[in-house]
Amino acid sequence: MIFGIKAQKEVDSLGLHYELTPTDFTSKVADCYDLYFTGVHESKIYAQLLLPKKSSAKHPVIFQFHGYHSDVGDWLDKLAFVSEGYVVVALSVRGQGGESEDCLQTSGGTLKGHLIRGIEDGPEKLFYRAVFQDVYQLTNVVSRLPFVDSSKMASYGVSQGGALALVCAALCPKVKRTFVQYPFLSDYRTAYGLEVTQSAYEELAYYFRYRDPLHEREEAVFAALDYVDIQYLVDRIQAEVIWAMGLEDRVCHPKTQFAVYNHIQAPKKLYFYPEYGHEYLPKFNDKIHQILGGK
């Protein structure tokens, strides 16, 4: 079972209710806005939106997604892309470090993280199902804004954000390029069998330790997580995929990343960093800039 048409139809039934209001942050190159829209479970979802200053033209878009537990970051971080003519939209993942609400009702434990949120209620109550739906709704809203050229869209993210950048490309065929670094949310069985307590997947170990110490529900747990395993979504991607991987990564192990990369049928390029782990990967942002047309 994978994230499918039913989940997208639930989002489509919400309509496109959003608010776009100027923010207090000012810039000589960008007009900056707070974007709020209605997500599933009546949650109010937030994103930063920046566009080239006082421009009446339509612009290409780059969607940005942040790492696990974090937030959208500073406005300043996005100005480089805006100065090159892009609209930048940075999603605040529900229930994490930013302003987005998470009104999903679940039972069971959530110790140590969101990956197991809703796991005892079945795949349709999983936290990340709602997050994937938010990503889909974000693309619906942004692609219809009057200053957006929806034929020129890209996505970018690191770790959790890398996973969501791939989800964005999978659920929105208008996305033409996606740039990712060491994405999270993949190949949960393999991740659990590795150094799980030192990884982004450590909450799986805590779940079994405290909620299912005899592993009587193990098969049901992993079957539910298949629903939000990005390796089963990425075959939908039509965009070009540019990927960076640190071969010493033990937070999102290369084995779990290859499970995803190998399922991508679209054009793709993988950059290896043999001496690097789950950390800043130099030169990759410069490559993104060059690929997006800043040569």
How would you describe each model-predicted region?
Residues 114-159:
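Gly/Ser-rich "nucleophile elbow"/oxyanion-hole loop immediately N-terminal to the catalytic nucleophile
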Residues 47, 51, 57-68, 88:
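Short beta-strand element of the alpha/beta-hydrolase
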Residues 236-237, 243-245, 249:
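Short beta-strand/loop motif that positions the catalytic acidic residue
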Residues 73, 79-82, 86-133:
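Cap/lid segment of the alpha/beta-hydrolase catalytic domain
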Residues 270-287:
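Histidine-bearing beta->alpha loop at or near hydrolase active sites
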Residues 167-214, 272:
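Hydrolase active-site cap/lid region
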Residues 247-252, 278-279:
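Acidic catalytic loop of the alpha/beta-hydrolase fold
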Residues 14-57:
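N-terminal cap/lid segment of alpha/beta-hydrolase-fold proteins
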